[in-house]
Amino acid sequence: MFQDKHKVTVENENIEDINYDDKPDLVGISVTVDVYPRAKEIAKRFRVKGIKVVAGGIHVTTAYHTIPDNIFDSLCIGSAEGTWPDIVSDMENNTLKPLYRCQNKIDGDKIASPAYDAISHSEKYLFCNIIHTSRGCPFKCDFCYNSSPDRTYSVRPVDDVINEIKAAHSKHIMIIDDNFLVNPARMREFLKAIKPLHLKWHCAISINIT
């Protein structure tokens, strides 16, 4: 999702202090419900300096209607792959909108891999090598965030997933799909492809496996 003309830095407050002395053109914050109060504080620190702040993530996607208009400059609803290029373009043209919604389902081969190379001081991180083979879930259980109308289900090509696993250079992979066993035929294809790598891995599946 990044272009060569853009310099991107990823900061994680769990590892290091946020550099508020930096003066980026745009700040993006991924928000879950547990970090929402802290996300508001971070946004305020940057916005008082005139820096635009965009919030996205699962909490914004599922509960954007609960977020006051004066907390962030813009909200990103749904998959960032379908909204981030427009957000950056509008920011550059000084036409940033208050809300961006991914209008189309993102095909699995368009799901972006984590930009680990953009993390500053990466030597401080212990990567657990998490992998998405899909995003979302075809079921709409009432208790789950996947019941949101802005949540869609997309499946990545098996070859694409295997290439990311190989790039991780790890013998222990954590698959964090919301529901790994949706398509048994695809699962068998994946198992056949991953077996020669001799990995330890785990995942979550739905109760209908029983």
Whereabouts are the PLM-identified features?
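Radical SAM [4Fe-4S] cluster-binding motif and immediate context
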Residues: 112-210
